[in-house]
């Protein structure tokens, strides 16, 4: 699975939420395109779903399925329709799926990437699920701006601003992979 670099405070906050069993059931990761918001979502989900002692371990069944993109309790909801948004039918499927318990672990997770084009009707359909998810239900939205989501949706999730990687963080990431940072 791809490594997420930078934004140490966000990574620490997410880790602490999970350690203390205080993770909210909804997040919005927002920031410029190309910052790794979906990678951050995968990293969070790996830690949430991991069954190993050191989370994420990368070697348990859950970590391997997530890395391979076949975890039955994780759905990366795809855009559909003419306007590159999310279809009403897709959101209804998510709501129906959410009603059944997880297949493999203790959580079911839905990642809605690039929500800038998510229309009002679709967001309103999701509102009840986001507002009152079952104990095992988690939602992660990514967007370039928090204004992409309705205030009613935003008020029920935790919004975290993802920043560009600093030069120092970039050099450290290159060095970690065996490249000269110069």
Regions from the PLM with identified roles:
Residues 1-112, 123, 138, 151:
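P-loop/Walker A NTP-binding region and its immediately flanking N-terminal helices
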Residues 93, 129-136, 159:
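A short alpha->loop->secondary-structure connector
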Residues 125-130, 145-158, 174-175:
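Short regulatory helix/loop adjacent to the ATP-binding pocket of P-loop NTPases
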Residues 156-182:
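Long, charge-dense, solvent-exposed interaction surfaces that engage phosphate-rich ligands
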Residues 118, 133-150:
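Sensor-1/coupling segment of RecA-like P-loop NTPase cores
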Residues 99, 113-119, 124-131, 147:
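Catalytic acidic motif of RecA-like/P-loop NTPases
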